[in-house]
């Protein structure tokens, strides 16, 4: 049965317009994006199949072009459409902050960084009002003491005349709990930036839907 044959109050698009996007399941949201299903599968059924195949909505949205296009019911056109939607979301968040909004909310910071991060150690540079100056992706791959150089972070902070920074990196495993190496590297960066009077406001470790804040744990 196609979605058009469903009762109106069960159709994803009508449900979104009536109740808002937060009320929809991942499969229903994805179905609105896909618009149509394939032979034998409605858009919602196809969405459920894709979510099961990729493991989660996050994994599907973060899939590379090859993996995405190889999936049944997807292809280059859908991949291009998805990348455009994701980029618009990133730019919307960036514009909210870069218009001068202060980073006073930990959740706002997390939303901004979660939209940016792809297995990377990043630096958010802030002015003395905690407004965003620049978002810089620094190091890629596994975070360890050999890959992160406090001196380089100091140079970048000075170059942009930052008054404060927020550090962030994600754990590809999806587990957000900081490792001993995470804490040791943070301490080194904290000490290096303290010498030039630049504050580290937070270090965010981002996992699969969970973010750990060093500041909230009292580690800074």
UniProtKB/Swiss-Prot annotation:
Keyword Zinc-finger (UniProt): no
Please report, in chain numbering, the residue ranges of the motif JAMM motif: 169-182
Which InterPro entries does its entry note? MPN, RadC_JAB, RuvA_2-like, UPF0758, UPF0758_CS, UPF0758_N
Q: Return one Gene Ontology term, BP aspect.
A: proteolysis
Under SUPFAM superfamilies, the record lists: JAB1/MPN domain, RuvA domain 2-like
Q: Where does Zn(2+) bind?
A: 169, 171, 182
Domain spans labelled MPN: 95-220
> Which GO MF terms are attached to this record?
metal ion binding; metallopeptidase activity
**Protein keywords:** Hydrolase, Metal-binding, Metalloprotease, Protease, Zinc
Q: Which CDD domains match?
A: MPN_DUF2466
NCBIfam families with a match to the protein in the record: PRK00024.1, radc
Per the similarity annotation, which family is this? Belongs to the UPF0758 family.
What protein name is recorded for this chain?
A: UPF0758 protein ASA_4229
